[in-house]
C-alpha cells in the first residue's frame, strides 16, 4: 500500500489518546477511505485492546464489526513530537507516531504486521518522529511494503 502525502500530518499535538485516534479517523473519513462511523469503531477498538504497539508507536484501527464502514484501504501517518499517552499516569505508553489504518478484508492485518516489523527498530521510529517533510516520511516508509 502506498503512503499518500495528504494522509501524513507532521507536528500534531493532542490532549489525549481519544483526540489523537479521532484525528486519524477523520483523516481517513475526509479522504473517502471510511464512513464516519468507523471513527467511533477506532475508539472502541482501543478500549477493547490497546492500539499502542510499543516503541512509541500506536496503530489505531477499527473493530471487526466496522469493516462494513471501510470504503477502500488507507493509512494515515501522524507525527506527535510531544507524544500522546496511550497508557495511564502510572504506566505511560507514549506514542510519537500514529498509523491510522482502514483495510478491506484482512488487508489491514498485513499492513499492521509490516509496520510493526519496521518499527521494531526504534531507530526507524526516531527517524519518523524527526522527519521534517511528508516526502521524508514517504521515503522512510517505502521500506514497509
Curated annotation (Swiss-Prot):
Residues 1-144 form the PTS EIIA type-2 domain. InterPro entries: PTrfase/Anion_transptr, PTS_EIIA_type-2_dom, Sugar_PTS. The active site is at residue 61. The modification Phosphohistidine is found at residue 61. One of its GO terms (biological process) is phosphoenolpyruvate-dependent sugar phosphotransferase system. It is found in: Cytoplasm. Pfam families: PTS_EIIA_2. PROSITE patterns: PTS_EIIA_TYPE_2, PTS_EIIA_TYPE_2_HIS. GO terms for cellular component: cytoplasm; plasma membrane. The keyword Cytoplasm applies. GO terms for molecular function: kinase activity; protein-phosphocysteine-sugar phosphotransferase activity. Keywords: Cytoplasm, Kinase, Phosphoprotein, Phosphotransferase system, Sugar transport, Transferase, Transport. Its main location: cytoplasm. The keyword Cytoplasm applies. It comes from the Bacteria. The phosphoenolpyruvate-dependent sugar phosphotransferase system (sugar PTS), a major carbohydrate active transport system, catalyzes the phosphorylation of incoming sugar substrates concomitantly with their translocation across the cell membrane. The enzyme II CmtAB PTS system is involved in D-mannitol transport. PANTHER family: MANNITOL PERMEASE IIC COMPONENT, PTS SYSTEM MANNITOL-SPECIFIC EIICBA COMPONENT. The PTS EIIA type-2 domain is phosphorylated by phospho-HPr on a histidyl residue. Then, it transfers the phosphoryl group to the PTS EIIB type-2 domain. This is Mannitol-specific phosphotransferase enzyme IIA component. It comes from Streptococcus mutans serotype c (strain ATCC 700610 / UA159). The lineage of its organism: Bacteria, Bacillati, Bacillota, Bacilli, Lactobacillales.
Amino acid at each position: 500500500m502506498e503512503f499518500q502525502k495528504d494522509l501524513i500530518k507532521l507536528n500534531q499535538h493532542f490532549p489525549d489518546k481519544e483526540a489523537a485516534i479521532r484525528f486519524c479517523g477523520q483523516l481517513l473519513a475526509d479522504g473517502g477511505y471510511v464512513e464516519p462511523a468507523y471513527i467511533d469503531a477506532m475508539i472502541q477498538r482501543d478500549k477493547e485492546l490497546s492500539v499502542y504497539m510499543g516503541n512509541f508507536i500506536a496503530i489505531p484501527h477499527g473493530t471487526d464489526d466496522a469493516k462494513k464502514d471501510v470504503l477502500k484501504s488507507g493509512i494515515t501517518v501522524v507525527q506527535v513530537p510531544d507524544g500522546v499517552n496511550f497508557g495511564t499516569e502510572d504506566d505511560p505508553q507514549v506514542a510519537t507516531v500514529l498509523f491510522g489504518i482502514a483495510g478491506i478484508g484482512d488487508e489491514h492485518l498485513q499492513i499492521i504486521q509490516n509496520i510493526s516489523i519496521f518499527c521494531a527498530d526504534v531507530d526507524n521510529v526516531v527517524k519518523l518522529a524527526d522527519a521534517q517533510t511528508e516526502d521524508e516520511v514517504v521515503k522512510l516508509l517505502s521500506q514497509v511494503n
